């Protein structure tokens, strides 16, 4: 597909069937911000960073110190599928009824999602990067455009996509959703990163692997080391994005939200989920 700028009356026709998306209004409104950016850091445990927060995420702290940081905000679920529905609607799970992947339950049409509300306000709404968990159950309703990559949703791609989108649609008031999973601990299904195997003792690198779902992972040196290293890497990439935003927008022209859908068991102080 392609985007075409249309400034005069045009007629589009073809001998073959074709699809035309909804038009994108190229205008700003003083009633809106030029950008509202919603960033989901999958599995990021704010409490899990503990006293190392300043060392792990200096760019995040620097940027959001100009706004509001909530230290006591907690998820309503232990994994993404039900948590995302709550995030997008503001409703507890007993209202959304969305609990388990594979169960064919769709969000009731009477519940309005955040992108549906933003679209009603005139924003061009784009799901710039996500795993697609809210597509079929309706939790991600309302986006004009969705770019979905199952599992492979690294922050480096999300940041670059976001910047390129903003440069392409700079004449719009944009609402963007970016989801990355670098901060999510994984188990034996994922190879050990080189930086971990190069620095940790051999016994930690070759520890018996738990092949259960990562939400059940118990605290261990390898998972903790990798998770903190990935958090540090995410902060570097987000610092690049934040520098771009502050260089191209005035303070009152944008809103950025950074949040997580759940914590992680690898930093837990107890053996309970």
Language-model region placement:
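Catalytic domains that recognize anionic headgroups
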Residues: 1-273
């Amino acid at each position: 597909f392609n985007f075409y700028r249309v400034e005069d009356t045009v007629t589009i026709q073809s001998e073959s069937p074709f699809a035309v998306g909804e038009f994108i209004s190229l205008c700003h409104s003083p009633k809106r911000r030029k950008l509202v950016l919603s960033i989901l850091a999958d599995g990021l445990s704010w409490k899990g960073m503990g006293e190392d927060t300043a060392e792990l995420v200096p760019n995040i702290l620097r940027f959001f110190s100009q706004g509001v940081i909530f230290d006591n905000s907690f998820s309503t679920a232990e994994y993404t599928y039900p948590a995302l529905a709550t995030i997008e609607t503001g409703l507890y799970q007993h209202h959304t009824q969305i609990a388990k992947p594979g169960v064919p339950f769709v969000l009731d049409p009477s519940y309005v999602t955040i992108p549906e509300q933003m679209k009603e306000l005139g924003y061009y709404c784009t799901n710039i990067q996500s795993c697609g968990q809210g597509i079929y159950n309706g939790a991600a309703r309302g986006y004009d455009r969705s770019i979905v990559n199952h599992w492979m949703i690294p922050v480096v791609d999300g940041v670059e996509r976001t910047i390129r989108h903003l440069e392409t649609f700079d004449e719009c008031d944009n609402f963007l959703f970016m989801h990355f999973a670098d901060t999510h601990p994984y188990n034996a299904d994922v190879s050990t990163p080189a930086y971990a195997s190069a620095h940790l003792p051999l016994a930690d690198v070759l520890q018996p692997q738990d092949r259960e779902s990562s939400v059940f992972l118990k605290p261990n040196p390898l998972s903790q080391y990798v998770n903190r290293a990935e958090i540090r890497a995410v902060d570097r990439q987000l610092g690049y994005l934040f520098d771009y935003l502050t260089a191209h927008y005035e303070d009152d022209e944008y809103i950025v939200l950074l949040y997580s859908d759940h914590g992680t068991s690898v930093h837990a102080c107890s053996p309970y989920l």
